[in-house]
């Protein structure tokens, strides 16, 4: 298997989903703007999304995938199928309980996650109603992520990468055609979440059947391997929860700021999700099962080499994305979101949040490379300790930044916290000899810095001298102008890299 090809496949399919995600957010911004309705929906949608990351894509995947890789390497296919059935039964059992509790406790959940909403009765009640419709998404998407973890472990990377597209399609269809049929109209978005979750799960089932894993889940408390997964999940849940708790605390802080602050941070975060989703998710998707295989076979040289490959690709592609997001922040926000109810003031506030977020992009994506280095070795406690320390530091930064910088300070704290997290993980991997840097890092970094300066300077000069207008022009013209700038930035960066000796085959890596 060519890992670079697999990364390109996962990244391109994820890109399709992210582009549709921007289309969806543009449509939502045009229909609802940034105000009470969107604030309540984003809070209600954030909570099941948070639990999804904790139970499925976060803690569960960290605990499940390495043990599944161990079964693949050391056990028979029949034993692996039994293991998967038992894990599916346990996961379904937990998810039913969590979903039921979430629906019943919706008022308390909203009060804890956005206490500022309690001052406005209508806003508070609407948040509760939206949460009760969106909460079953946790059950659907967690099972979908479970299926995706199995497919990824068998190198069927494309199917799970394409699956999120269905949620965006559901959002787009409901926003365009069903809003008039709901009262209040924002309830259409909540039902779009539910339908999208159903579609994501159902789409993957035929491929699961081809692998022989589409069996009725079976609840077993006596399976030793399932108990190992549960034991690994305990610290993993704590670790993933720490990151999500940080986001919830930021929402709590933002709920006390002026109306629209939650939405400004949300839209800026959506722009950040393009590189984190395309590159970060793609790297994490490929690295965890592959590293787990090397850990199971105790091949330390291949393990370290794979981490080195991931870090180089991470820096090569993430740093220009961060520079681009910062330098092109205003063109990006106005082109994608500034229509109808989304005002120039909303665009400027979102721009400032995006610039602050961009400082942490390299940290966010490096975590996706470094953390699997621990998870694959079934060491979850170390990243948890790092995450807890980072949470404390992030909240101290929130307290320091919120008064002078408002919502921008909250965004900056998240970014700097991510960089701190990544730096500590890197230090610990080096300290324990798990990762040994390959040759040529100094020259690699110098060439990258030169290329980034050329790219950033070129984009800044282009915006200064080219007669581009971003406020009083139509969406198609803005999109055309933005494409010109993106093409210019990408061209400057990759031509500079080529001139300095970089070639695609330098990053090719083949795994069995």
Regions found by a protein language model. Give the residues of each.
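Membrane-embedded alpha-helical bundles of multi-pass transporters/translocases
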Residues: 1-512
């Amino acid at each position: 298997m060519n890992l670079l090809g697999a990364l390109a496949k996962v990244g391109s399919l994820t890109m399709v989903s992210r582009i549709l995600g921007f289309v969806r957010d543009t449509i939502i911004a045009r229909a609802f703007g940034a105000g009470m309705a969107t604030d309540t929906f984003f809070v209600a949608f954030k909570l099941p999304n948070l639990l999804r990351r904790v139970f499925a894509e976060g803690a569960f995947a960290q605990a499940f995938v390495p043990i599944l890789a161990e079964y693949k390497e050391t056990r028979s296919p029949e034993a692996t199928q039994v293991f998967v059935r038992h894990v599916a039964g346990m996961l379904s059992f937990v998810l039913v309980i969590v979903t039921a509790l979430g629906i019943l406790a919706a008022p308390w959940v909203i009060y804890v996650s956005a206490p500022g909403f309690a001052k406005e009765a209508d806003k508070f009640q609407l948040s509760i109603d939206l949460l009760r419709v969106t909460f079953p998404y946790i059950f659907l998407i967690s099972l979908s992520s479970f299926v995706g973890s199995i497919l990824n472990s068998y190198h069927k990377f494309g199917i799970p990468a394409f699956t999120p597209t269905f949620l965006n399609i559901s959002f787009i269809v409901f926003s365009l055609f069903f809003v008039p049929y709901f009262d209040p109209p924002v309830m259409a978005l909540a039902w779009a979440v539910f339908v999208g979750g159903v579609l994501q799960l159902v789409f993957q089932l035929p491929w699961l059947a081809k692998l022989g894993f589409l069996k009725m889940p079976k609840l077993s408390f006596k399976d030793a391997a399932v108990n190992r997964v549960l034991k690994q999940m305990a610290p993993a849940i704590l670790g993933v929860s720490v990151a999500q708790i940080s986001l919830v605390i930021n929402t709590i802080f933002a709920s006390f700021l002026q109306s629209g602050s939650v939405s400004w941070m949300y839209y800026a975060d959506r722009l950040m999700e393009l590189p984190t989703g395309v590159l970060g998710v793609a790297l994490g998707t490929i690295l965890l099962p592959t590293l787990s295989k090397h850990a199971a076979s105790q091949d330390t040289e291949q393990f370290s080499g794979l981490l080195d490959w991931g870090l180089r690709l991470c820096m090569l592609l993430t740093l220009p994305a961060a520079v681009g997001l910062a330098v092109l922040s205003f063109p990006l926000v106005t082109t994608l979101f500034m229509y109808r109810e989304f005002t120039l003031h909303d665009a400027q506030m979102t721009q400032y949040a995006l610039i602050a977020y961009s400082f942490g992009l390299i940290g966010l994506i490096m975590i996706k490379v470094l953390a699997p280095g621990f998870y694959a070795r079934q060491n979850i406690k170390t990243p948890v300790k790092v995450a807890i320390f980072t949470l404390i530091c992030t909240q101290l930064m929130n307290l320091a930044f919120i008064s002078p910088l408002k919502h921008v300070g909250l965004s900056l704290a998240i970014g700097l916290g991510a960089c701190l997290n990544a730096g500590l993980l890197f230090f610990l991997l080096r300290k324990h000899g798990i990762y040994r840097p390959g040759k040529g890092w100094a020259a690699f970094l110098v060439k990258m810095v030169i290329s980034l300066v050329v790219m950033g300077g070129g984009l800044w000069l282009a915006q200064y001298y080219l007669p581009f207008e971003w406020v009083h022009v139509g969406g198609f013209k803005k999109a055309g102008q933005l494409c010109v700038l993106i093409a210019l930035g990408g061209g400057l960066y990759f031509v500079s890299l080529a001139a300095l000796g970089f070639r695609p085959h330098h990053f090719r890596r083949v795994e069995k």
